[in-house]
Amino acid sequence: MKNVTDSFVSLGHWSSAGSFGLNTDILATNPINLSVVLGVLIFFGKGVSDLLDNRKQRILSTIRNSEELRGRAIEQLEKARARLRKIGMEADEFRVNGYSEIEREKENLINATYNNLERLENFKNETIRFEEQRAINQVRQRVFQQALQGALGTLNSCLNSELHLRTISANIGMLGTIKEITD
C-alpha cells in the first residue's frame, strides 16, 4: 500500500520536461491506470449509456416506422395490383363489348342499306311502270286521234250535202223519239 501512495506522491514530483519515461513498476502503474479508466467510465459511462440508449430508441423507432411504412407500401401495392387487375378485366370486357357493339352496328348498317336499296328498287319499278302506263296512254291517245282524224277525213270526203241533210234529219228524229220516251 505504501507503494501505491508513493506512486501518487511521485506524480507530483514529475518534471514537465516533456519526456515520457517508461515506468516498469507494474504494481504502481496498473492500479493508477485502472482507477483512471474506472473513474472515466463511471463519470462518462452514464452519459454514454444514456446517449447509447437514446440512439438505440431512435434506431428502434426508425425501424418501427420503416416497418409500418413498408407494411403500408405493401398494402398499397396490393391494392394497386388488385385495381390494375380489375381495370384490365374491365378493359377486356369493354374490348369484347366494343367489338360486339361494332359488329352489331355493322350488321344494322348492312340491314339498313339493304332495306334502302330494296325501297329504291321498288320505287324504280313503280316509276318504270308509271312511265310505261303513261307512254301507253299517250300512244293510245295518239292512235285514237289519228283514227278519228282518218275517220273524219273519210267522212268528209264521202259526204255530200244530200247525205249530210239525211243524217241530220235522222239524228233529229232520234232525239225527238228519245224526248217523247222520257216525258
UniProtKB/Swiss-Prot annotation:
**Location(s), subcellular:** Plastid, Chloroplast thylakoid membrane
Membrane topology listed for this record: Single-pass membrane protein
Question: What is the designated name of this protein?
Answer: ATP synthase subunit b, chloroplastic
Describe the function of this protein.
Answer: F(1)F(0) ATP synthase produces ATP from ADP in the presence of a proton or sodium gradient. F-type ATPases consist of two structural domains, F(1) containing the extramembraneous catalytic core and F(0) containing the membrane proton channel, linked together by a central stalk and a peripheral stalk. During catalysis, ATP synthesis in the catalytic domain of F(1) is coupled via a rotary mechanism of the central stalk subunits to proton translocation.
Bilayer-spanning residue ranges = 26-48
Annotated GO CC locations: chloroplast thylakoid membrane; proton-transporting ATP synthase complex
A further note on this protein reads: In plastids the F-type ATPase is also known as CF(1)CF(0).
Q: Which organism is it from?
A: Drimys granadensis
Q: Which CDD domains match?
A: ATP-synt_Fo_b
Q: Which gene encodes it?
A: atpF
Quaternary structure note: F-type ATPases have 2 components, F(1) - the catalytic core - and F(0) - the membrane proton channel. F(1) has five subunits: alpha(3), beta(3), gamma(1), delta(1), epsilon(1). F(0) has four main subunits: a(1), b(1), b'(1) and c(10-14). The alpha and beta chains form an alternating ring which encloses part of the gamma chain. F(1) is attached to F(0) by a central stalk formed by the gamma and epsilon chains, while a peripheral stalk is formed by the delta, b and b' chains.
Which is one Pfam family of this protein? ATP-synt_B
Q: Which domain of life is it from?
A: Eukaryota
Q: A GO molecular function for this record?
A: proton-transporting ATP synthase activity, rotational mechanism
The family this protein is said to belong to: Belongs to the ATPase B chain family.
Which lineage?
Eukaryota, Viridiplantae, Streptophyta, Embryophyta, Tracheophyta
Q: What is its main location?
A: plastid
What are the alphabetically sorted keywords of the record? ATP synthesis, CF(0), Chloroplast, Hydrogen ion transport, Ion transport, Membrane, Plastid, Thylakoid, Transmembrane, Transmembrane helix, Transport
